[in-house]
A protein has these predicted regions:
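Extended beta-strand/beta-hairpin segments
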Residues: 1-53, 64-149
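Alpha-helical metal-binding/catalytic segments enriched in His/Glu/Asp
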Residues: 58-59
Length: 149
């Protein structure tokens, strides 16, 4: 079994219909998630958008970390993430591909020095590499009666 680095907890509570308030264990801020139009009201990002955003954000932050360690100056950092929802073999929706385009705003003088950084950072992105490898997801559904609170 791999060595544990950190464990975290995220809680979700239904607001109404498909809207859920997401609470992160170490943050005061919450996030409202919802289903897209046709199912939900599109009041917040949906789970597939959050997964794509997590991949893009992790890659972007990892690139910034590597650039700083290499002493590279970034004039800006931008990312564009495009995900495609497709029908899987069983006919159910699945994320078929997540495409991430990064623009780190490298200074002309740093272009050559940046090569090693740009070739290595991707492997250190925990979210991207976990998604690529497949994640062990374990689901348990409580079967006790609700008290209605």
């Amino acid at each position: 079994m791999p060595d544990l680095i950190k464990e975290f907890k995220i809680e979700m509570e239904q607001v109404k219909d498909y809207e859920f308030l997401v609470k992160f264990d170490d943050l005061a801020e919450t996030l409202l998630m919802d289903a897209p139009p046709g199912v939900g009201r599109n009041a917040g990002p949906c789970p597939t958008q959050m997964l794509a955003a997590a991949v893009g954000n992790c890659l972007t932050m990892t690139l910034v970390l590597f650039a700083r360690k290499a002493g590279l100056q970034l004039t800006h950092v931008r990312a564009a993430v495009k995900a495609r929802l497709v029908r899987g073999e069983n006919g159910l929706p699945r994320i078929g591909v997540i495409q991430v385009e990064l623009d780190p705003g490298l200074a002309e003088a740093d272009q050559e020095r940046a090569a090693a950084c740009l070739n290595a950072f991707e492997n250190y992105c925990a979210v991207t590499e976990s998604v690529r490898a497949g994640i062990d997801v374990r689901v348990a559904v409580s079967r006790h009666a609700s008290a209605g609170n």
